[in-house]
């Protein structure tokens, strides 16, 4: 599901150029807090490799007098994330996966509606495996069909608000979930920018245009990964949510190449197994004496990433 929303975010701002991105992330070693035992039970680090491509197949340019410059587009998105976790000293029965692979393919269609509205439809499939091997993909076990229908209101040229429905069969049967979208691109003076996005996780960036080919950004990103697997003969989902804050210099080469580098901290990197049931999605892992929930996660750690994006703008 995450992949399809990532493509929606990109597709709403894409033009006639294809876009390809590659990214490598490193999260340093830190202790793992287990919510059930209320203690640290192990430690670990992680490397995350991501690649994505968004290819517009056909495009009708926006009307010249359209203040929101809304094109009509058909496109295809491909996405892959490969997580390698180096876990140590976890007791038997509490081990986390050492690998997670998420792959997705999505067909998308975007078109303007009336004066301030756009419609976006998406249909795709993704695989969520506990191994970084194509042979670990099994239909009926870790392959999920998904789709989305989102209406976007262009409140202002730099503010978009959307809502709709998302569909997937995570639990073995079709389920409909609400989908929300928000995007803001603003600026004050000639040098400072603000970007806020919310559809595949929260993303906030405060930017400063130091030179024509160099931006500095303070970024905060929330994301995550999943693996559908069997433990003790039962279907379960391993999920990992991440929250990263860092300083990101972004180097630009010409109009179509950007190289972002990020240095900062990983403040949330959870790790939890759930039954593959709808009720389990809302169940607390453990609770404190006052009734508040607590979750298993790695302690804060050093974060470093490097990437390159080609095409797009």
Language model region names:
Residues 19-90, 195, 199, 309-313:
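Short glycine/proline- and aromatic-enriched beta-strand/turn motifs that initiate or cap beta-hairpins
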């Amino acid at each position: 599901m995450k992949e399809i929303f990532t493509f929606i975010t990109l597709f709403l701002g894409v033009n006639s150029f294809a876009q390809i991105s590659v990214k490598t992330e490193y999260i340093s070693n830190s202790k793992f807090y287990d919510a059930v035992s209320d203690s640290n039970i192990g430690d670990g680090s992680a490397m995350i490799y991501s690649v994505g491509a968004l290819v517009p197949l056909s495009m009708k340019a926006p009307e010249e007098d359209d203040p929101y410059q809304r094109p009509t587009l058909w496109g295809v998105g491909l996405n892959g994330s490969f997580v390698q976790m180096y876990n140590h000293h976890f007791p038997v029965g509490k081990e986390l996966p050492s690998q997670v692979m998420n792959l997705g393919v999505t067909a998308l269609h975007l078109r303007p509606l009336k004066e301030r509205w756009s419609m976006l439809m998406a249909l795709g499939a993704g695989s969520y495996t506990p191994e970084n091997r194509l042979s670990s993909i099994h239909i009926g076990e870790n392959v999920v069909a998904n789709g989305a229908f989102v209406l976007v209101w262009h409140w202002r040229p730099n503010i978009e608000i959307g809502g709709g429905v998302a569909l997937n069969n995570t639990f073995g049967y079709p389920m409909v979930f609400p989908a929300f979208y928000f995007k803001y691109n603003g600026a004050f003076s000639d040098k400072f920018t603000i970007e806020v996005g919310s559809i595949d996780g929260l993303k906030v960036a405060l930017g400063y245009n130091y030179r024509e080919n160099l931006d500095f950004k303070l970024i905060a990103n929330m994301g995550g990964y999943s693996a559908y697997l069997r433990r003790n003969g039962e279907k379960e989902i391993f999920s990992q949510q991440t929250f990263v804050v860092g300083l990101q210099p972004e180097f630009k080469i010409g109009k179509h190449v950007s190289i972002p580098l990020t240095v900062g901290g990983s403040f949330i990197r959870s790790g939890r197994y759930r039954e593959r049931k709808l009720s389990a999605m809302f169940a607390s892992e453990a609770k404190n004496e006052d009734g508040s929930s607590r979750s298993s996660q790695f302690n804060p750690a050093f974060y470093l990433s490097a990437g390159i994006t080609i095409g797009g703008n």
